[in-house]
Amino acid sequence: MRAKTLLAAIACAVLLISCGEKKEYIFNGENLDGWKTVLKDDADAITGASTFSAKDSLMRVTGKPFGYIRTEKKYADYKLHLEWRWTGGEGVDGGIFNRLQDGDVVWPLGVQLQMTPKDMGALMGGIKMDGIEGPFYRKPRVVEESPEKPVGEWNEMDFLCKGREMKVWLNGVLVNEASCDATEGYIAIQSEGGPMEFRNIYLTRSK
């Protein structure tokens, strides 16, 4: 009887959570509709055309030339979820921008979430954060065992942006948090040196 009661309580909790949040996939897995590419000024049509591509439910990034692909829409309060892996045999520099501002330059104004090996989860950028004018850099939290997975394996990142609050989880472990003066902006994925793949890119927001 107690077991049945416990299972019922768990089921109710799951139902409440699912009813309270709605997933919005910002990458459809088939093409790059809803995204805009920004590359270095000297990138020509040949080298830049395939920097970002969509195939087999994956967004693929070559890493060359430098630049990023951003959403066409701006977003305010959300929790961003995405999964990625390095595909070139070694970890490379990479990043995700949140609260990205207008301008469409290769080194934009926004909050960059570092995806570099051994610096995973660091926050940096030119926006005012924690009451300090940019440029800004906050190291990831020191944890007993790094939650980062080896090259070739899928990592999961969750990035909460709610008002001025920011929190970052890497594979379920809280690795960073800060406050940011910007409360709205684009979301972007960098091309910065080497190949990576992304999947399951979506937002959850309270209804």
Regions found by a protein language model. Give the residues of each.
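Bacterial N-terminal signal peptides that target proteins for export
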Residues: 1-7
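Carbohydrate-interacting regions of secretory-pathway proteins
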Residues: 19-207
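Low-complexity, intrinsically disordered short segments enriched for Gly/Pro and polybasic residues
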Residues: 9-11, 70
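Hydrophobic h-region of N-terminal signal peptides that target proteins for export
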Residues: 11-18
